[in-house]
């Protein structure tokens, strides 16, 4: 039975805004989501209108409250998460000056190269390797060079989550989470890296960022009268500092202790781990001080294309499996999993490189491309489907290996998302990486994580750890099979060796195709 007080979490995702209401034990009463669009003006560009975010947020909150049966006065607090780094520029009247640059926008590829070329000490966060075109320095530099009027007249440049907090409270704050993970903020060295931004010629942007950087869960203020009237919530309702969707999602999976990692799955994999001590090195991002849990360090990795490759295969090449599924009254994925389950480990020598849309880690290479190699006339659709699942697991293990090389030891992976429905895939992840894989009872990690932060900000729980202990619950744990792990090692090694040998051809092909389509973002990368 639901137990008050009730907590609200709001998730600003790529495709829409989702609100959820939970009781103090983490039991979900309701979720309500509202979708919005994305514009793609040119290849490699992606923009959204913050006005759409707000209208969707209002509708999502009102819908959640109405469907929950909970009185607005019974809600103790609210917090938010959103995509990062989705950049908003505002004028002196706090009016949005242009469409927001969405996280997936890579128009700043040339600027990202110049960020790396500075060699600034702040680049330790990515091992002094390639900096991402998605991140704040690259995008703000692009604004200054390509839209100087917007840049000069912008009084505030912030991330999506910071903008939501401002709309709710009227207070300008930045999350330690997004500031450190996406803008090189480091409170151990004084905060914003002035030398990095100065070397790029955008030192003045530091005055445009929100003036206060807060830990997640910190009380920011109360709902303004205007926001309260629009949302149908009480004026003064406590609002807690939120953060990036994947990282707040890690909280919602209970990743609050050293050695634990969140594996947040969907069209991509986001990997976020907690450590007791800092770890730095090329091939992953971090360590970020207090980035998620105060007093701990966070590391991050990611795979650009995972579930999207699985869906691609099902939609393009699984007509026979779909027909069989329709005949039996089951899902197409059920049939594909059965076929893959009858194929031995290693898919009879078939390797899939999951770089279909580039590589996030360990190479941060937007020009990398996917591969299927080792094909023979004896391979079947079941072989290819299994090889896709295995290839994604190999990519995760490659990131884990890179982290291990620099001192971080993954002890447990907590997984959320659609792939948790596949026992075969979850067992593969456990076997390939030789770590237990846990599946939480509540899969809506970002919304729950935001609700947990609201619980801390409202004083329902004294800190994030207490909130996690009370609000996150494990449904099942998959233990690794040692024999299978030993058998997988050979195939993981072949996977790891593939990219270095094919990198030159990948880049040549990617640039050639980009020049044919007119995509300057890729052609200049």
Positions of PLM-derived features:
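A short local loop/turn or secondary-structure capping micro-motif enriched for an aromatic residue
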Residues: 37-40, 106-108, 280, 307-308
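N-terminal glycine/serine-rich phosphate-binding loop of ATP-dependent small-molecule kinases
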Residues: 1-98, 153, 229, 233, ...
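Structural signal for short hydrophobic segments within the conserved structured cores
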Residues: 30-34, 211, 476
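Short beta-strand-loop/turn "lid" adjacent to the catalytic site in phosphate-handling enzymes
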Residues: 66-103, 129-136, 165-185, 212-217
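Active-site core segments that coordinate phosphate-bearing ligands/cofactors
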Residues: 2, 7-9, 113-130, 138-173, ...
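Residue-level signal for inorganic ion chemistry
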Residues: 26, 49, 78, 105, ...
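Short, acidic/turn-prone active-site loops that include or flank metal/cofactor-
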Residues: 34, 102-108, 178-179, 267-269, ...
